[in-house]
């Protein structure tokens, strides 16, 4: 083993990534078919119909499932969902798969987290690569807005209350 006087894997700091970290964002869970992914880079566009736009990993199974099924569920997560968010983000092990970390209900849009009070059933409108992400633009078809106590927020690379 070698002891380094500096970081052993020096990388230049990415100013765009640092800007994104300073913005922070509400953590959501996107599911479609048998796939899911935590997403904190998202926005909602008001209109008739309303829309949800999310930046997702272009190599993720979620992208493939959304494009194949054309529908999905977007749920807003709470502090109690931290472990589930880590499992769907691929940062912690999930023996048996990430869907074993929660209780699920089946909807016409796919599986939704049963104890997430706010969720939207969405229909995919378009998927475009932008930067190192895929921009999923989805029409809100069904929406339930519930209690928002103790939201799960991601800022500077960690979860906050």
What residues fall within each predicted segment?
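Basic, polyanion-binding surface patches
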Residues: 2-161
């Amino acid at each position: 083993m070698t002891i380094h006087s500096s970081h052993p894997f020096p990388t230049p700091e990415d100013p765009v990534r640092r800007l994104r970290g300073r913005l922070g964002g509400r953590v959501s869970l996107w599911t479609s078919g048998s796939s899911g992914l935590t997403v904190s880079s998202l926005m909602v566009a008001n209109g008739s119909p309303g829309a949800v736009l999310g930046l997702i990993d272009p190599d993720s199974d979620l992208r493939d499932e959304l494009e194949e099924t054309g529908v999905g569920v977007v749920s807003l997560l709470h502090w109690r969902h931290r472990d589930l968010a880590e499992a769907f983000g691929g940062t912690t092990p999930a023996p048996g798969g990430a869907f074993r970390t929660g209780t699920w209900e089946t909807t016409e849009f796919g599986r939704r987290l049963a104890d997430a009070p706010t969720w939207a059933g969405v229909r995919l409108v378009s998927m475009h690569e932008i930067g190192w992400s895929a921009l999923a633009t989805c029409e809100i078809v069904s929406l339930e807005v519930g209690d928002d106590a103790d939201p799960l927020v991601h800022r500077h690379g960690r979860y906050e209350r």
